[in-house]
Amino acid sequence: MVWQPTSGQSAIDQDIRVGTQRGSMNQNPLLAHAPLGTVKPVLFNNPPPEKVFGYTPAKDPEGAREVMMVWKGHNASPGKDEVKPSPDFKTLNKMAVASGLSTAKDLPAFRKEHADVKLKTAHEVNAASPTRRSNLPTIPPSKQGNMFGMPSGYRTAEVVRSFGPEEPPVKYLVQGAYQDEWVRKNLEAEAAGSGRGRPYIPPAPTKAVLGHSYGASRYLQPPNNEEPWKMSKFKTVGPKVTQYSGGSVRASRTAPADGDEYAAAEAPAE
């Protein structure tokens, strides 16, 4: 919407302000409007890049490089005097007793005469007394031609048992010689197994195979239409029970055959 004032110049509604005009109104998010199709402007002033939020610690002159890659020797504090070793009173007392001094009044003068008897430092004690590390065998110099470990050609019993007494040549591994040897051995075994001089051993049949073969042989037998054998005295006797020749049981009951009617007629007579 464009408003036309009396002067004839057009002005946008958002530029029209009523009342007091302040510069802070341009930074007020409640009054500022984003132009159409643009991002809303930032309404706060960023601090200068040199401003640091929070506490700024002092830079440590000794960084990671000085700690990990630079070796610094120990420097004694200048304000402290060098600590001198104290007198070895146990040794002085033994020496005084060996000299025939047995009273406490004679000990101060004896200690002044033997002021050089001091306690040994830890470095002096370790240097004088043999340690466990000093008893370990030393490695001979390389100029003597000594060999440490086992040579490259040595094969243990476990390696010999698993991979053979010798290492296979790299030439055979690259050229596939062992693969060709495996194929040749299998072809020789196949040719030896298919020879005519070897007798054929048929497989042993199981009970299931025998049962199937017997049923198939009975099924494939031709039908025998000959009259079944009977004794001469039974040839003139009629059958008492008819032979079931197929069909459903219900049909045989509802529609009996001629022989069944004859058998039913003779049943009450018996």
UniProtKB/Swiss-Prot annotation:
Acidic residues biased stretches: 258-270
Chain intervals for the UniProt region annotation (Disordered): 128-148, 215-270
Protein name: Cilia- and flagella-associated protein 77
Main location: other
Gene symbol of the encoding locus: CFAP77
Stated role: Microtubule inner protein (MIP) part of the dynein-decorated doublet microtubules (DMTs) in cilia axoneme, which is required for motile cilia beating.
Keywords annotated in UniProt: Cell projection, Cilium, Flagellum
Family to which the UniProt record says this protein belongs: Belongs to the CFAP77 family.
UniProt organism field: Chlamydomonas reinhardtii (Chlamydomonas smithii)
Disulfide bond entries: none
GO cellular component: motile cilium
Subcellular location as annotated: Cell projection, Cilium, Flagellum
Residue ranges, compositional bias (Polar residues): 128-145
Pfam family, one: CFAP77
